[in-house]
C-alpha cells in the first residue's frame, strides 16, 4: 500500500520489477561512481558485469531501462564520452537500419511464413528431423542473408504457432482477438500441453539460432564482422569461403550431428515433441485457412512470395545495405497487399524498436570497453606470444571476449591491431591471413555461449516470444552449452591442425 510520495516514486521506479531487483539497480548506480574514482579500469569491468546481469534478468525487467540508466551514468561520470557513443552507433548504422526496417519487413510477410512453416511442421513427424531441418535451413539462409533477418523469420513463425494454440486453449476460435501473453484464461486440461509446447518451441528456436552461427561463419556476408575482415584482407566471396572452409565445414557438420544427438538423448532441455492436442489444433487451423482462402488472400500470399524472392536475391547479391532492402520489402509488401493505414504499419515496428534502443545502450557499454581499454591487455598478451601458437590463442581470446562483448566489436578491435602489426612489418602476409581466419572463426563460433555474444541471440532473448515460451538468459546459456563445447572445441582443434 502506497501511503507517501517517496513510496509512490519507488513504486513507479522500474514498475512491477521485484523489489530486490530495484534495490540491486540502485546499488549499482551508487557504487559505480565510487569505483570509477578508485579505478576506471575496474569500474569498466564492473559495468560490463552489471549490464550482463540486466540481460540475465530480462524476464524480470526489460534490460533497456536498467541498462540504459547504467549507460547514462557511465556518460555522466566520464567513463565514456557522448561522442564515443555516437561513433559506436554511427559505425553500426547498418545493424540499426536492419533492425528497424528488416524486422518490420518480415512482419508484413508473416502470413506466407506461417502458411509455409505450418505445412512443414505438420508434414514432418520426427522431432529430430524437424530440428535438423530448422538448423540446416537457418545455417544455409544465414550464409547468404543475415543472422538477424533469419532469426526474425523464425521468431515470427514461432509467435504464430504459439498464438494459434494459446487462443484455442483459452476457449476461443481462430478469428477471435486474444492476448496470448495471459495464461489466466488457458483451460486447466491444456496447461500441461502448453508447457510441453513451450519446451518444443524453445528447442526449435535454439537449434535455429545456433544454425545461424553455423552458417554465418562460412561466408563474407554471413555476419557483419565477416564483411569487415574480408575488406581488410581483400578477399572476395569465393576466397573468403575457401579460407574459412577447413574450419567452418567440419564445425557445421559437427553442429548438425549435435542437433540430432541432443534431440535423441533429450539432454540440456531438448527432445520434447509437439503434443498431440497442439498438432490437432494446428491441423484444424490449417484446414480453416484453406477453407477461407479467397482469391484476394491467395493474391496476398503470391505477392509476399515474390517479395520474399526479391529479398533473397537482393541480400545474396548485396544490392544495397540490409536495412534499405528491408525498407524496400515494407514498401512492396504493404503497397501490393493493401496495407495503407498508419496504425497498421506502426504495429510492424513494435517488435524491433525496443531492441534497437537496447542495442544503442549496448553500444554505449562497448564505448566504455573502447575508452577504458579493457581488452588491450589481453590483445597485447596474445600478440606477444610465439607466432606458432598465436592462431589458436587468437581463437580462444576472441571467443572468450565475444561471450562478454559484441562479437563485431571484438573482431574489429583484433583485426585492426593485427593489420597495424602487418603494416608495421611485424608479421608477414601468410601469418596475417592465418590470424584473420582465427579472428573470424573465434568471434563467430564460441560466442553462441551467451546471448550477448551475438546480436541474433540477444534479439531472441529480448523478443516477444522469449517470455511466452519461458526462454530466459540462463536457459539460453544452458541450452547453448553443448553447442559451445562442440563448436568451440572443434573450431580450436581445426585452427591448430590446419593453420
UniProtKB/Swiss-Prot annotation:
Family stated for the protein in its record: Belongs to the NhaB Na(+)/H(+) (TC 2.A.34) antiporter family.
Transmembrane spans: 33-53, 66-86, 89-109, 128-148, 237-257, 305-325, 326-346, 349-369, 393-413, 449-469, 477-497
Family annotation (InterPro entries):
Na+/H+_antiporter_NhaB
- Catalysis performed (reactions): 2 Na(+)(in) + 3 H(+)(out) = 2 Na(+)(out) + 3 H(+)(in)
Gene Ontology CC annotation, any one:
plasma membrane
Does Transport count among this protein's keywords? yes
Q: Which organism is it from?
A: Hahella chejuensis (strain KCTC 2396)
Q: According to its record, how does it sit in the membrane?
A: Multi-pass membrane protein
GO molecular function terms attached to this record: sodium:proton antiporter activity
Source taxonomy lineage?
Answer: Bacteria, Pseudomonadati, Pseudomonadota, Gammaproteobacteria, Oceanospirillales
Supply the name of the protein.
Na(+)/H(+) antiporter NhaB
The yes or no answer to whether the keyword Nucleotidyltransferase is present is: no
Briefly state the protein's biological role. Na(+)/H(+) antiporter that extrudes sodium in exchange for external protons.
The record's keywords, sorted A to Z, are: Antiport, Cell inner membrane, Cell membrane, Ion transport, Membrane, Sodium, Sodium transport, Transmembrane, Transmembrane helix, Transport
Domain of life of the native organism: Bacteria
Q: Where in the cell is it found?
A: Cell inner membrane
Which pairs of positions does the record mark as disulfide bonds?
none
Amino acid at each position: 500500500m502506497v501511503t507517501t510520495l517517496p513510496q509512490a516514486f519507488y513504486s513507479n521506479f522500474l514498475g512491477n520489477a521485484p523489489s530486490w531487483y530495484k534495490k540491486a539497480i540502485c546499488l549499482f548506480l551508487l557504487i559505480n561512481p565510487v569505483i570509477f574514482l578508485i579505478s576506471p579500469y575496474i569500474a569498466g569491468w564492473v559495468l560490463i558485469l552489471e549490464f550482463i546481469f540486466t540481460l540475465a534478468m530480462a524476464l524480470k525487467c526489460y534490460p533497456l531501462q536498467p541498462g540504459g540508466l547504467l549507460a547514462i551514468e557511465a556518460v555522466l561520470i566520464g567513463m565514456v564520452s557522448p561522442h564515443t557513443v555516437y561513433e559506436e552507433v554511427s559505425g553500426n548504422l547498418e545493424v540499426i537500419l536492419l533492425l528497424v526496417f528488416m524486422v518490420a519487413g518480415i512482419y508484413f510477410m508473416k502470413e506466407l511464413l506461417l502458411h509455409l512453416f505450418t505445412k512443414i511442421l505438420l508434414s514432418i513427424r520426427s522431432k529430430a528431423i524437424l530440428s535438423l531441418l530448422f538448423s540446416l535451413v537457418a545455417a544455409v539462409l544465414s550464409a547468404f542473408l543475415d543472422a538477424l533477418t533469419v532469426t526474425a523469420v523464425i521468431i515470427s513463425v514461432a509467435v504464430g504457432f504459439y498464438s494459434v494454440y494459446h487462443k484455442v486453449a483459452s476457449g476461443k476460435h481462430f478469428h477471435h482477438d486474444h492476448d496470448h501473453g495471459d495464461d489466466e484464461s488457458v483451460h486447466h486440461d491444456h496447461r500441461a500441453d502448453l508447457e510441453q509446447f513451450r519446451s518444443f518451441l524453445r528447442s526449435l528456436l535454439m537449434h535455429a539460432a545456433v544454425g545461424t552461427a553455423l552458417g554465418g561463419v562460412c561466408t563474407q556476408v554471413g555476419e557483419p564482422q565477416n564483411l569487415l575482415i574480408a575488406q581488410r584482407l581483400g578477399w572476395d566471396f569465393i576466397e573468403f569461403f575457401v579460407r574459412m572452409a577447413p574450419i567452418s565445414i567440419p564445425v557445421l557438420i559437427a553442429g548438425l550431428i549435435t542437433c540430432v544427438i541432443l534431440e535423441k538423448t533429450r539432454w540440456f532441455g531438448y527432445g520434447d515433441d509437439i503434443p498431440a492436442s497442439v498438432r490437432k489444433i494446428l491441423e484444424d487451423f490449417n484446414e480453416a485457412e484453406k477453407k477461407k482462402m479467397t482469391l484476394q488472400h491467395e493474391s496476398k500470399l503470391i505477392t509476399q512470395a515474390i517479395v520474399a524472392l526479391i529479398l533473397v536475391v537482393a541480400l545474396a547479391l548485396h544490392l544495397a545495405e540490409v536495412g534499405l532492402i528491408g525498407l524496400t520489402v515494407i514498401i512492396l509488401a504493404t503497397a501490393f497487399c493493401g496495407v495503407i493505414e498508419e496504425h497498421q504499419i506502426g504495429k510492424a515496428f513494435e517488435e524491433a524498436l525496443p531492441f534497437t534502443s537496447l542495442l544503442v545502450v549496448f553500444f554505449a557499454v562497448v564505448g566504455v570497453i573502447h575508452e577504458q581499454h579493457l581488452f588491450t591487455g589481453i590483445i597485447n598478451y596474445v600478440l606477444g606470444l610465439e607466432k606458432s601458437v598465436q592462431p589458436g590463442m587468437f581463437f580462444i581470446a576472441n571467443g572468450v571476449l565475444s561471450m562478454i562483448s559484441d562479437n563485431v566489436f571484438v573482431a574489429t578491435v583484433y583485426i585492426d591491431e593485427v593489420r597495424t602489426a602487418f603494416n608495421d612489418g611485424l608479421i608477414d602476409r601468410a601469418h596475417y591471413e592465418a590470424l584473420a581466419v582465427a579472428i573470424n572463426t573465434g568471434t563467430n563460433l564460441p560466442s553462441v555461449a551467451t546471448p550477448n555474444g551475438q546480436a541474433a541471440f540477444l534479439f531472441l532473448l529480448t523478443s516477444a516470444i522469449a517470455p511466452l515460451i519461458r526462454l530466459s538468459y540462463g536457459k539460453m546459456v544452458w541450452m547453448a552449452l553443448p553447442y559451445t563445447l562442440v563448436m568451440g572445441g572443434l573450431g580450436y582443434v581445426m585452427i591448430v591442425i590446419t593453420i
